[in-house]
UniProtKB/Swiss-Prot annotation:
Binding residues for GTP: G60, G61, G62, C63, N64, G147, T148, G149, E178, R182, D225
A cellular component term, taken from the record's GO annotations: cytoplasm
Keyword GTP-binding: yes
GO biological process: cell division; mitochondrion organization; organelle fission
Database matches in Gene3D superfamilies: Tubulin/FtsZ, C-terminal domain (3.30.1330.20), Tubulin/FtsZ, GTPase domain (3.40.50.1440)
The UniProt record lists the keyword DNA repair: no
Any one GO molecular function term: GTP binding
Designated name of the protein: Mitochondrial division protein fszA
Amino acid sequence: MSQFMIRYQIINLSKVFNSPKSLNFIKRYTTSTASTTTTTTNDDSNWISTPNITVCGIGGGGCNSVNNMINKELYGIDFVVANTDAQALAISCSRKMVQLGKTLTRGLGAGAVPEVGKKATEESIEELMNQIGDTQMLFVTAGMGGGTGTGGAAVIASAAKAKGILTVGIVTKPFHFEGKHRMKLAEQGLIELEKSVDSLIVIPNEKLMEQSQELYIGNAFQMVDDVLYNSIRGISDILVKPGLINLDFADVRSIMCNSGKALMGVGEGEGKGRDAIAANIALNNPLLENINISGAKGVLLNIAGSDLKLQEVDHIVSLVSSKVDPSANIIFGSTFDQQLEGKIRVTLIVTGMDQLIQQQQQQQKQTKIESQVEQKLHSTTIVDQELKPIEPQKSIIIEEEQEEQQQPKPIIPGIFVEQELLTTTTTANITPSQQKQESLTQNNIFSPPQQQQQQPSINLQPNYQQLYQQLYQQQQQQLQQQQPISFLKRLSNLFFTNGNNNKPYNNNKNTPGSNYE
């Protein structure tokens, strides 16, 4: 009876202490074998065979996410925070904290310079690794784009991986409104972090806005912290939390060790068909960045609920298996969560996506370029269609000019009209026999067309062509200068001027300076 009461007290106390080490400490001093266990080694594996999992938050974003996890009582996790800003560490909820770069930054922060954050982390890396301790799995969380998190996350990850710790990076990319410079720093930091971790999960903050576009700025950052919380919880629960189906740490290590970039999706469903709803939401989650996961090589699946049925678990696993490579390594676990109250939550971690992500990004760039080219072509066709109605006006003007050319030119005193010149030249050259033959052919309407003589073509003389061309050029120049001059005045200036002194002709014999003198 006494042993039963002791175990009942242990179960109640386990709800207060969230880490396995604290639970083992209680068991060591409350069981009947306490006298013997106090003299044994400090190896806790004899009591609870659960892996030690640690979350390290670095920088302002990482410290905020750790505070959110502690406030939500994430089960079975140790927390460590590190920052160059002493004021941010003072309000942290974590018991383990490290001030980075005490001599370099003096607790004043990195000033959004990743190089300063990197050097500050290298200065305090030994103290930080002592706080992390002998853990089997380390989550490095940070908000990329600043100074401390962007520069120091890769330093912590490389030091942990060198000790044989399974290192997973879960970081965020900034919103668009935070600026292009911050986004550029984040992308550079992601390149360095990817080289230092076993698996990297990147959460783009901009994708979260697609779920709800009417968010206040404070709620938006809270939603980012909740996504980080759910991603770590989806992995840690199947290792340390009791449930229907628990996984070994070796299974998780086989999926996430040296797996490169990974993607995450979370979905919840309730009511009829809740299993299919939760699975489809997780598979079509915006955090998957619209990337086809059919070529994924590893899948980690966590199914949580308060009243799960075996048939629902089987249906969810079959739906996820149909979307990935048939040869993919799929491991799944099922845990109890009384807070869901009739809901099912599916957490999906897809690994081995490096090549698929690169191919998808190249295709997206290519489609973006093609769409830009199509838009330019569409805009040019619209401009052409707007300019096409001008062409009939041009043709009308040309037809009017041709009609004016066909009409007889006005007779101006002092010069010969081209028609008179042409008629005199043609009649002078035709003999009387040719005139008689021409009249016969014109009167004979039944004569074949081959025997009919063609009318002589009327061609302007070169002198008149030059004059008309000069008139046209002067007219265009004067229209541009907006100085209208009458047509007759221009003709008089051209035809009635003296070639020597450019004076007008004087036809009056009695006046001095006339051309008849």
